[in-house]
Structures are given as structure tokens and as C-alpha cells.
Swiss-Prot record:
Region of interest called Disordered, as start-end residue ranges on this chain: 1-73
Region (Interaction with the viral DNA polymerase) location: 256-258
Location in the cell: Virion
Gene expressing this chain: 3
Lineage: Viruses, Duplodnaviria, Heunggongvirae, Uroviricota, Caudoviricetes
O-(5'-phospho-DNA)-serine found at: 232
InterPro entries: DNA_terminal_Gp3, DNA_terminal_Gp3_C, DNA_terminal_Gp3_sf
GO MF annotation, one: hydrolase activity
Xref: Pfam families: Phi-29_GP3 (PF05435)
Protein name: DNA terminal protein
Amino acid sequence: MARSPRIRIKDNDKAEYARLVKNTKAKIARTKKKYGVDLSAEINIPDLESFETRAQFNKWKEQASSFTNRANMRYQFEKNAYGVVASKAKIAEIERNTKEVQRLVDEKINAMKDKEYYAGGKPQGTIEQRIAMTSPAHVTGINRPRDFDFSKVRTYSRLRTLEESMEMRTDPQYYEKKMIQLQLNFIKSVEGSFNSFDAADELIEELKKIPPDDFYELFLRISEISFEEFDSEGNTVENVEGNVYKILSYLEQYRRGDFDLSLKGF
């Protein structure tokens, strides 16, 4: 392969190099002074004579132009009233991810809202009506985040938490893991409520047999399958033993196929 010819530095090259160096240094100094962010490691400023080929020089010019371009949100920053600084690119990313999480949560709630829920063995209305009496998070175990508002972020740790949480929750596998963890937590709650109770032992074994997505829909639709009815520290609430028998009765109906679990895999 033929080697690229060594660059011949022209007057217009010198002028453009000087302009880009000036703008780059000014950008670094301005950002450091205004936001306390040191960008000096983000771009090199080599001597003009160090470029061996025109291709090398052109590549550096592109990098320097991008670095100083106000449209490059990666190097544009905002500082809120609490002194928290973030790039506009990061703020925009968290906003996008938050909107996507809201969309996913709304999609899941809309898929289940018309389903009947049961209490005392009888239909008591729809899941949407149940949500209206409490909250979506209370019924579904899924929290719908509020719109991201950078002006209200008080600390960098809070910003990192929001960034990581929203990014994680855009992954569909997050909700699959949530269903698995919800089932495990409920089984643990039942286990912690009794020292010795045969019906509870039977319930625990039956719960372990249920696929996580089926359990999640049963959790949504049966009021007795509730953490409020059990206590994982070993203390029981009133009528909890009777509640065990009610859940076993529901699970018998589930095994017979009496529940239309059409949310499976949603």
C-alpha cells in the first residue's frame, strides 16, 4: 500500500490551525471557569509540525471542530441552582430514557387494566378500578417515573441514581427480573409468617411451581395475594391463616385453567 505523502504546511493551514487551537483552548478555559469541568483530556492539541500527513491533520481538524461546535451537546453543560453540573447530552439521554420507561409502564398498565380482580372469591371490579382506589405502583408493583427535571436534582449521587435507574428500566428484561423477584419476595413473606402450619407449607410449594409471569398476573388480580396479609419477620396479621386457605383455593382454580391469564408474556 502506498504511503500518504508528507503534509506540506500552507499559510491557510497555519491560519486554520491557529483558529482551532484558539477556540479549543478558549472552550476548555471557559468550561473550567463556568462549570468546574476540565475538558483538557478530551482533545489533544499537537504542534502543527507533528502532523505527518494531510489525513492526520484533517482528522484532528474534525475533532477540534466537533469539540468546539455548540451543537455538540456532549460538551455543552448546564448548572442548576444546587450546583449540580451535567452535560446537555446526559440530560437529554435521561429525559429520553425516562419517557421510554413511562411508555413501557403505560403499555403494561393498559394491557392489564380491564382484567377483573377478586377479593373473597368474588369479582370486585377491574384492575383499573382497583388502581383508582390506590395507585398504579401499589397494585402493579411497577413505579411510573415522573418527568425528569434537572432543575430539581440536588446532588450528583441523585443524578447518577436517576441515570442508572432509567437506563436499566428501558431493558425489557428488567421487568422479567422484577416478576421473578416479586414472586420470591412473596414466598419469603409467607415463609416468615409461620413457624409450623401445614397449609402454609402447601401454599409455599404451590407458589414455587407457578411460572413468574403467571404469578404476576395472579398477584394483580387476587387481593389476598398481598404482602400486607403476611409479615416476613414471623408476625402474622389478623385472619392470615384463613387467607392461606383462600389463596390455595384460587390456585386450585388456576390449575384447572379457570383464570384467563392472557397477560402471559406481555
